[in-house]
Amino acid sequence: MTAPRKPAAFRIEPEAAPTQETPKARQAELSRKPRGLKTDVALVIPAEVDVFDEPDIVAAEPPPAAAPRKRSLFGSIFFGAIGVLVSLAVGLWTDQLIRDLFARAEWLGWLAAGMAAIAVLALVVILIREFLAIARLAEVEKLQKRALDAIARDDPKAARSVVDELSAFVAAKPETAAGRRALAELRGEIIDGGNLVRLAEAEILGPLDARAKVMILEAAKRVSLVTAVSPRALVDVAYVVFEAGRLIRRLSELYGGRPGTLGFFRLARSVLAHLAVTGSIAVGDSFVQQIVGHGLAARLSAKLGEGVVNGMMTARIGIAAMETARPLPFSAAKRPGLGDFLSALTSFAAKKDTETTGSGK
């Protein structure tokens, strides 16, 4: 048995109080005095550009059509003077011909005079029709500008005038009857100017836009097929020009333009000006890369691939013609792009390639 332990004293050191120092330090940090920072120097770190995240060029919307530049005053004077000289030359030649026929036989002179009178009368009628067609095309341009102005100012009165003029312009189109009737029922309603123009665009021009897209796709398919089977490149170019001209005229007639011969040339010039402004007249490397990216080069033969490229060029011309001949600019409806036609055209070309390969076997 051990002896009991003697009592002893121990020194106890005080513990640190972190709970008190930490709040004080945090409070001092939060309550520090404000200080000024230099704002004249900023460091901007640009984000890395991923080429695979770039928007598809065929899905991008083409810029709106720009108004064609007016001819200079001296150019108008020159062509006007040339026209007067040509008219005088034709008149003098006709007069001399009639005099010679009267000198040879009186009945021949009277016959020539009657034919000249009939020709002049027919020419006057043709010129009147051409001027009316040109005036109708000019009315389309004015209507587009007035619609843009009504949307920008949000003016209900100007928008109502635009809607009434649009309804009268496409009154001969049965596809627009339901839309015109719907707009007529809303005449007494209070609607903002911009919304009224957009509503008229969707209700009246919606069916015409659907038909226009079908026309453009069918024209692109025909160009693609003819390019695939034609033996010469000259035939391809000639048919592309022919199909593009026919597509421009059909789209103008669809939207109520009814262009004549002179009106067609003016419309074609406006379409080409739009293509030149938007840079869409040439198929660039980016467009070819998009076609290759869709796997077209691996699925189609060389001729059918060339046909798809020509078909997409025809579709681009059709889009420009659609925007030029449309009475209202694209506001409520989405402006069509090449992406709307590429999938259907490539499917058509792949089907034709499969049929050709199967028949060859």
UniProtKB/Swiss-Prot annotation:
Q: Which GO terms describe its cellular component?
A: plasma membrane
Report the protein name in the record. UPF0283 membrane protein mlr0776
- Where in this protein does the record put region Disordered? 1-33
Q: Please, which domain of life does this record's source organism belong to?
A: Bacteria
Q: Provide the alphabetized UniProt keywords.
A: Cell inner membrane, Cell membrane, Membrane, Transmembrane, Transmembrane helix
Major location category of this protein = membrane
Q: Which organism is it from?
A: Mesorhizobium japonicum (strain LMG 29417 / CECT 9101 / MAFF 303099)
Q: Where in the cell is it found?
A: Cell inner membrane
Family stated for the protein in its record: Belongs to the UPF0283 family.
Where would you find the membrane-spanning parts of this chain? Answer: 73-93, 108-128
Residues making up the signal peptide according to the UniProt record: none
Q: Where is the composition biased (Basic and acidic residues)?
A: 23-32
Cited InterPro entries: DUF697 (IPR021147), UPF0283 (IPR006507)
Question: How is the protein disposed in the membrane?
Answer: Multi-pass membrane protein
